[in-house]
């Protein structure tokens, strides 16, 4: 892309609870992917002239985590700390993408069923702090469906902070049937910390949590039959894997590998009185009109980083088949790039010629204020 073309290109920023994915509309993958973390020093600086900053964002916070306290400004998909969120957006525009936000329309994403105030405040910061010429807020799961090349289906989107089932028919999300589950990657990381502690390995600090997250991403998988897998793990060492910690110590994990993500199907493991993701998917389909259920069963799209566990698609297929009518054709679609499918869908949407009239412009914002977002983005 030449500079002249990149002038007016829209920016797409998928602000996840765990990772920020950002880049230019029309690209096939995000340019910048970094943790949604703001870190502040735990101790007073002693080295004079080291130019210590009072806060670090993203990868830099991650690499200096040993001396920092790490905070995630987005919890369960909702922005809870606006000052830190502003730092993350600033870092995205100026350090990662190296663009002037006042020159680019910007597409942001949010979780379904988010509080209205959250969306208004996002709009306000974009126009007033970053002076963007235009912006739009899209629902994450809808973008994932676009990325899979469909306009009808039910998306099971599970990220780091929130999971949800969103049935979509001909491009419209059906709000009455959306199921939201505040159980996602971060809870699984916490649970893995807990069960590793039971094994005698201690992980406590915010920095150590990041190590456990890495163990989870590298070694965990979903069992097709949990009870049988537990029996196998108890009777042999075939399921054991070892992991080297940053200090060189090697730890071995066995049944924790599949006990951790099993929580998605049995939230009671972490004391939640909720249905598992297979049941929420089924319940969500059952809340839809009887005529469209067949299309939803045949188009179960998985998206988000927490659906990256090996074995999850087969397990979903098995569980939903058990719940659905016996003659129903059930298909689980798990695209290999599903970690980024929300961003990819945003990139597709923002580059459509038909979408260009959908942007909220600076002028519209100045006339109507932040509430314009509810009228133009649905």
From Swiss-Prot:
Organism: Ciona savignyi
Taxonomic path: Eukaryota, Metazoa, Chordata, Tunicata, Ascidiacea
Any one Gene Ontology molecular-function term assigned to this protein's record: hydrolase activity
CDD domains in the record: ASKHA_NBD_actin
Annotated EC: 3.6.4.-
Catalytic reaction annotation: ATP + H2O = ADP + phosphate + H(+)
Pfam entry (one): Actin
Protein's recorded name: Actin, muscle
UniProt-listed InterPro entries: Actin (IPR004000), Actin/actin-like_CS (IPR020902), Actin_CS (IPR004001), ATPase_NBD (IPR043129)
Family designation: Belongs to the actin family.
Cellular component aspect of the GO annotation: cytoplasm; cytoskeleton
Domain of life: Eukaryota
UniProt subcellular location: Cytoplasm, Cytoskeleton
UniProt keywords, alphabetically: ATP-binding, Cytoplasm, Cytoskeleton, Hydrolase, Muscle protein, Nucleotide-binding
Predominant place of localization: cytoplasm
PROSITE patterns for this protein: ACTINS_1, ACTINS_2, ACTINS_ACT_LIKE
Keyword Ribonucleoprotein assigned: no
Function: Actins are highly conserved proteins that are involved in various types of cell motility and are ubiquitously expressed in all eukaryotic cells.
């Amino acid at each position: 892309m030449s500079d002249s073309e990149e002038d007016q290109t829209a920016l797409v920023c998928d602000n996840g609870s765990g990772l920020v994915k950002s880049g230019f509309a029309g690209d096939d993958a995000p340019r910048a992917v970094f943790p949604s973390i703001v870190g502040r020093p735990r101790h007073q600086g002693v080295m004079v002239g080291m130019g210590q900053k009072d806060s670090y964002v993203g990868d830099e916070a991650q690499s200096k985590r040993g001396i920092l306290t790490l905070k995630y400004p987005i919890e369960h998909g909702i922005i809870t700390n606006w000052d830190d969120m502003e730092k993350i957006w600033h870092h995205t525009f100026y350090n990662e993408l190296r663009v002037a936000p006042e020159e680019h329309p910007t597409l942001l994403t949010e979780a379904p069923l988010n509080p209205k105030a959250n969306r208004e405040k996002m709009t306000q910061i974009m126009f007033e702090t970053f002076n963007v010429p235009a912006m739009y807020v899209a629902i994450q799961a809808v973008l994932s469906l676009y990325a899979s090349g469909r306009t009808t289906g039910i998306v099971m989107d599970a990220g780091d902070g929130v999971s949800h089932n969103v049935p979509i028919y001909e491009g419209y999300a059906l709000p009455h049937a959306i199921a939201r589950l505040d159980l996602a990657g971060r809870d699984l990381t916490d649970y893995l910390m807990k069960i590793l502690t039971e094994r005698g390995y201690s992980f406590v600090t915010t920095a150590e949590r990041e190590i456990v997250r890495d163990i989870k991403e590298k070694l965990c998988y979903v069992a097709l039959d949990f009870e049988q897998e537990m029996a196998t793990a108890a009777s042999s060492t075939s399921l054991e894997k070892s992991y080297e910690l940053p200090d060189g110590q090697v730890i071995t994990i066995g049944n924790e590998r599949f006990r951790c993500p099993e929580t998605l199907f049995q939230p009671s493991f972490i004391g939640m009185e909720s249905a598992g993701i297979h049941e929420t998917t089924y319940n969500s389909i059952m809340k839809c009109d009887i005529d469209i259920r067949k299309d939803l069963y045949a188009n179960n799209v998985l998206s988000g980083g927490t659906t990256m566990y090996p074995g999850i698609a087969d397990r979903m297929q098995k569980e939903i088949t058990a719940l659905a009518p016996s003659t129903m054709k059930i298909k689980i679609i798990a695209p290999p790039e599903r970690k980024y499918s929300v961003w990819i869908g945003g990139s597709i949407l923002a580059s459509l010629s038909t979408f260009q009239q959908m942007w909220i412009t600076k002028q519209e914002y100045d006339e109507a204020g932040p509430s314009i977002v509810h009228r133009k983005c649905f």
